[in-house]
């Protein structure tokens, strides 16, 4: 799926429409704990989070994530959208819960980005 498909599956609003949303999404990670995001994600991972502060964009930038989906209908300040655009990190917004958002993406074939004992299937393909 690309980010346009993700937006469609999640009934999401695209908050950074000037960015390229044709990039492919292979795996996703849902978290509000940014230390977990840094520890367990791989480049190009799609992050689903309820966080709406600038640290979520800075973390996505450091981890080279493929985009951010703000869940639970949390209000996103314009400054967060501007920072995401400046960092070239696609930002989407949905009223769905984290649980339902992750479930819809999983049903659509997006893989989880978690470590499985003895398996390297959690690694997102290089894009």
Question: Which sequence ranges carry the predicted segments?
Answer:
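Short, structural beta-strand-to-alpha-helix junction motif
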Residues: 1-4, 97
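Short secondary-structure junctions
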Residues: 11-18
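Feature 3881 marks metal-assisted phosphotransfer/nuclease machinery
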Residues: 125-127
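Feature captures the catalytic cores and cofactor-binding loops of soluble hydro-lyases/lyases
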Residues: 22-23, 27, 31-46, 50-123
